[in-house]
Amino acid sequence: MMRIMLFLATNLAVLIIASITLKLLGVDRFTGQNHGSLLIFCAVFGFAGSLVSLFISKWMAKMSTGTQIITQPRTRHEQWLLQTVEELSREAGIKMPEVGIFPAYESNAFATGWNKNDALVAVSQGLLERFSPDEVRAVLAHEIGHVANGDMVTLALIQGVVNTFVMFFARIFGSFVDKAIFKNEDGHGIGYFIATIFAELVLGILASIIVMWFSRKREFKADEAGARLAGTGAMIAALQRLRAEQGVPVQMPDSLTAFGINGGLKNGLAGLLMTHPPLEDRIEALRRLG
């Protein structure tokens, strides 16, 4: 899923910008003493950031990757790509998404969009050049699985919940620091502002661990969908090809590399922020499906 990290970054940026704006406008002072009102206030802005990210996800993905949408196929490869996505979409019971190709040497693909009937599926030029037709079909089926499963909407809801609690507890922490350490009893001072922003950054990272855990679980489900649509053997072969290419340098920005079918490698604590399970685990899970 070549969308998660940009989605998270957008959410965090919205939270911080909202915090600064609300502080400058003086809105925070009306919610600081009433925790019920504060929670509602945080929920409104927490879900706003999540929904903004969801609704502009296609535009962000196109701009960030340089994806060229195929409207009129110019080659037999583009024609095959459109026909394959149309067939897989029909089998999955969704409206055909937009189809695109983005210029990247590494083998990758992504699907995004605010609902299953208004989505985008794109593959890298490198994947088209090096993968067999059956393997490309399996990768497309995996991405169609994400769309059919409604993963982006579910992710937006989860992100909205964690955004809410990040904003809420950051402000509780900010009030404590402002009063207990800075001894400010007259509204919100500079201590509140600094502590709130700091807490949002820290809690935002911790909240990302929850979202990444969800993302890893959904990868297994997308693999299962890919196996149903394209065949278990083809899905395993595609993942094995990705595993063989793990040493290929990634040309895309770091904020986007975790958005695709190939999520890269991380070890130790960094593994908690992986959007994808290890390829070995995904292959083994497919083998258990038979």
Swiss-Prot record:
Any one Gene Ontology MF annotation carried by this entry is: metalloendopeptidase activity
For the keyword Repeat, the answer is: no
Family annotation (Pfam families): Peptidase_M48
- Catalytic residues, per the record, are E143
Name its cellular compartments.
Answer: Cell inner membrane
Q: What is its EC number?
A: 3.4.24.-
For this protein, the record's NCBIfam families field holds: PRK05457.1
Q: What is this protein called?
A: Protease HtpX
Q: Which organism is it from?
A: Ectopseudomonas mendocina (strain ymp) (Pseudomonas mendocina)
